[in-house]
A protein has these predicted regions:
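Conserved helicase/translocase motor-coupling segment
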Residues: 1-70
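Amphipathic alpha-helical transducer elements in NTP-driven molecular machines
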Residues: 29-33, 65, 87, 100, ...
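Conserved nucleotide-binding/hydrolysis micro-motifs of P-loop NTPases
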Residues: 10, 62-65, 92-94, 107-110, ...
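Helicase C-terminal subdomain and adjacent C-terminal extension
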Residues: 112-178
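Alpha-helical structural signal in soluble globular domains
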Residues: 67-78, 155
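A short beta-strand element within the Helicase C-terminal
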Residues: 88, 92-108, 124-125, 133-137
């Protein structure tokens, strides 16, 4: 199964970083790690370790990959699972598979610019690495401007789940105004 976690209403934005014009979306990466931990908790940490359920975290941007690696290294709650976690770029994951894949798309901008996410061969590599489950985090508002991603999003987010997420965000916004 494919799950798309839409970050459109979360005000996550991509940033340029370093001389290489790398892109990073720290808030999206942080959410990905929260979702990963919640998924492990749902399965059961003991079961994950006993059955050696492995996880891949993929992002098309090296800066995002490095940020995720650093956060995992610093995370006490993910420490028992580090040997089961692989974090890499799309190109770095070519030829590999994992039981569960999380993808951080990074791109979140008002112009709908998605850079080399336009290269569908690379995205094919990313979305075909999961043996059991694929979770994609990305801003649907940015990505839906492109036909492939619109169709992927539409098949990944049933309308009742999308409404449930929007309701949940609304409740959180009301409870924790910024």
């Amino acid at each position: 199964p494919i799950n798309w976690i839409d970050t459109s209403d979360m005000d996550f934005k991509e940033e340029f970083i370093g001389e290489t014009f790398g892109r990073i979306n720290k808030a999206e990466a942080d959410l990905l790690l929260q979702e990963l931990k919640a998924y492990i908790d749902r399965i059961g940490g003991k079961r994950v370790l006993e059955e050696r359920i492995d996880f891949g975290i993929i992002s098309p941007y090296k800066a995002q990959v490095q940020y995720l690696r650093n956060k995992i290294k610093a995370s006490g709650s993910l420490k028992p699972y580090r040997s089961l976690l692989t974090v890499n770029t799309v190109d770095g994951f070519q030829g590999q598979e994992r039981d569960v894949i999380f993808i951080s798309l990074v791109r979140a901008n008002e112009d709908g610019q998605i850079g080399f996410l336009n290269d569908l061969r690379r995205m094919n590599v990313a979305i075909t690495r999961a043996r059991m489950k694929l979770v994609i985090l990305g801003e649907a508002e940015t990505m839906k401007r492109h036909k492939f991603y619109k169709e992927l999003i539409d098949t990944s987010i049933p309308s009742h789940r999308l409404a449930e997420r929007k309701t949940h965000r609304l409740i959180l916004k009301y409870l924790f105004p910024s």
